[in-house]
């Protein structure tokens, strides 16, 4: 397994040397699919957890390059990186869809780049910009709704915002799914939403709301129907942006809720039948969630 991981990272070195960019959805090559700059998190995770046997300096240069570039006509690099670097978010009025999702993912990716750079001993003059940009998730938070909301290049939040709308500001989801996507700074997110009590209220609301199909600004996509069939409010485990959410209760002082919802998800949304997955498998992510949770559950007992 270790050798397989090494090969995956080495493949990224080769891809960068041959094409000038790291692949973000290699199926195959630089497929134009999904958002974010998550080669950064893959590389950082591998190195920080002790995996070696590849050219980390080339990858470091690749991460810095891709954070400030875009490969034309594909999702490799960062779409709208100039606006993101200038404004601290991707605006929703420049013809770039999924802008809130991109902002949240880029902020997380910036944190992973900073963390890797720190591990490599890179100077502050080189890495502090990524530490600063890791806070950019705060720039799409609208205190009026206590949710992440699209905003224009003038700084105006979307005036027709609805939290349940699967709008073009998000990727295959709505604001309730994406507003908790601050993987690197849960305490910062909790503070942003008004503290633990208010944060827990927002988390509880995800499960208490009706499983309404948010088709205010787009037509049906299969993820909507899957969420409705799951019947867990606005919790959409069939798609990845929200799969970590229940664990945030561990950071907000109510860990028993995390335990309850993890068990509910395991028992209700996974079966050994032909339709045993509750949505997209997406390169093994949905099954990996179950395997990881099952392992920790067994060890706890």
Where in this protein do the model-derived segments appear?
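Catalytic cores of secreted/periplasmic lytic hydrolases that degrade extracellular macromolecules
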Residues: 43
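Active-site-surrounding "flap" and adjacent substrate/cofactor-binding loops of secreted or lumenal enzymes
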Residues: 10-26
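Mid-membrane cores of alpha-helical transmembrane segments in multi-pass membrane proteins
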Residues: 35-38
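Active-site core of glycosidic bond-cleaving carbohydrate-active enzymes
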Residues: 40, 50-135, 139-298
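Conserved small/polar residues in nucleotide/adenosyl-binding loops
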Residues: 4-11, 296-301
């Amino acid at each position: 397994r270790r050798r397989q991981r090494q090969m995956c990272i080495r493949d990224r070195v080769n891809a960068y040397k041959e094409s000038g960019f790291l692949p973000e959805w290699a199926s195959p090559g630089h497929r134009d699919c999904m958002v974010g700059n998550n080669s950064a998190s893959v590389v950082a995770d591998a190195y920080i957890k002790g995996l070696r046997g590849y050219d980390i300096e080339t990858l470091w240069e690749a991460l810095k390059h891709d954070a400030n570039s875009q490969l034309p006509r594909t999702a490799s690099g960062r779409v709208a990186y100039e606006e993101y670097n200038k404004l601290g978010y991707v605006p929703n009025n420049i013809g770039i869809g999924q802008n809130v999702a991109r902002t949240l993912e880029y902020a997380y990716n910036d944190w992973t780049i900073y963390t890797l750079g720190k591990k490599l001993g890179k100077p502050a003059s080189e890495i502090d910009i990524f530490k600063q940009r890791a806070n950019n998730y705060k720039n799409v938070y609208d205190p009026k709704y206590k949710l992440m909301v699209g905003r224009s290049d003038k700084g105006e939040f979307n005036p027709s915002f609805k939290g349940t709308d699967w709008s073009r500001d998000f990727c295959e989801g709505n604001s309730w799914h994406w507003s908790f996507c601050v993987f690197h700074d849960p305490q910062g997110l909790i503070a942003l939403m008004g503290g633990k009590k208010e944060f827990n209220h927002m988390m509880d609301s995800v499960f208490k709301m009706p499983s309404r199909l948010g088709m205010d600004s787009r037509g049906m996509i299969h993820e909507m129907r899957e969420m409705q069939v799951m019947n867990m409010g606005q919790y959409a485990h069939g798609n990845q942006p929200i799969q970590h959410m229940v664990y945030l209760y561990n950071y907000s002082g109510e860990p028993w809720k995390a335990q309850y919802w993890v068990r509910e998800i395991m028992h209700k949304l996974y079966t050994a039948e032909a339709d045993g997955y509750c949505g997209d498998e997406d390169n093994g992510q949905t099954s990996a969630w179950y395997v990881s949770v099952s392992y920790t559950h067994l060890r706890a007992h």
